[in-house]
A protein has these predicted regions:
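Extracytoplasmic soluble-region selector
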Residues: 1-146
């Protein structure tokens, strides 16, 4: 690969193939280990922080590079606040990059509950905060039950 995109906290493995040499030893280095660290023998890249780094694979005098871009995970919700009547439901839709397990939690289950798929049910009048989390990113939705 000439380029790769990896999300912070995730890994990818770069492979280098050498032809014509029986016992060729390839070593990997990173131009910026604080952004993308690489195991010098396996080529496994760990994304550490947002930014770019160039991973170099070297065998003897031959070098090849791969530009690695590290992105922060994102979580986008279809709404930041919601209104629902007692006994009725509304839904929060979450989009995460990279995709992962999204969790929903009500800060006050006596006012509003939330299911594992983001469906909010109004229990009694008041306000509650719904916390949505994925890949270490947290967002909140203020729910008003009428």
């Amino acid at each position: 690969k000439k380029t790769a995109t990896v999300y912070k906290g995730k890994t990818t493995t770069l492979k280098a193939t050498v032809t014509g040499t029986a016992a060729a030893k390839v070593t990997f280095t990173s131009s910026n280990p604080k952004v993308a660290a690489v195991n010098k023998t396996t080529g496994k890249v760990t994304a550490k922080a947002k930014g770019t780094a160039v991973i170099t694979a070297k065998c003897g005098d031959v070098k090849v590079t791969c530009k690695v871009t590290v992105k922060n995970p994102t979580l986008t919700l279809n709404k930041t606040s919601a209104s629902v009547k007692v006994g009725k439901t509304t839904k929060i839709t979450a989009k995460a990059a990279p995709s992962g397990k999204v969790t929903y939690k009500s800060g006050n289950k006596k006012i509003a509950t939330v299911s594992s798929n983001g469906t909010i049910k109004g229990i009694k009048k008041g306000t509650a905060k719904i916390t949505v989390t994925c890949n270490g990113v947290t967002k909140t939705v203020k729910v008003t039950v009428k």
